[in-house]
Amino acid sequence: RENGGQYTHSAIWVIIAETMLGFGDKATELYRMINPIEHARTKEASKKYKVEPYVIAADVYGASNLAGQGGWTWYTGSSSWYYKAGIEYILGLKIEKGYMKIEPCIPKEWKEYQIQYKWKESIYNIRIKNTNGKNMGVSEIKLNGEKIENYIKLDGSRNIYQIEVTM
């Protein structure tokens, strides 16, 4: 049933690998392909997919009589990997041991995006600018207007931080 189809865990690992290689366009294209909403945009597509359009399927069948049908939607760990691929590897927001690091790998066409991250009682308003149309590579990070290195120590003391990332 999975021959020639989509095995979601491995497909997500391919997305992560694409970002590690700096291929943000391809990574985002694959990310969108796996998105269950993309399998249910029309009534016909929903009938073919046959599973919930709001849950990641463990696999999407490739055999001709089942081609495009999702399977094992509530029985997979793929959703956590999908979330991780999107947040940490494409958008580039990584949190580890009390520090934030921002390393996006995005499509060249994305000129700007924003993330608001709450940690304990603090809020981090993050604006990523990609005016040069790059897939990856951070040239500058400013925290509240001051240039800093890429590791930001998280502070949970009810502060609001403005982070500007230039690619």
Task: Describe each PLM feature range.
Residues R1-Q6, I12-M167:
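Non-catalytic C-terminal accessory modules of carbohydrate-active enzymes
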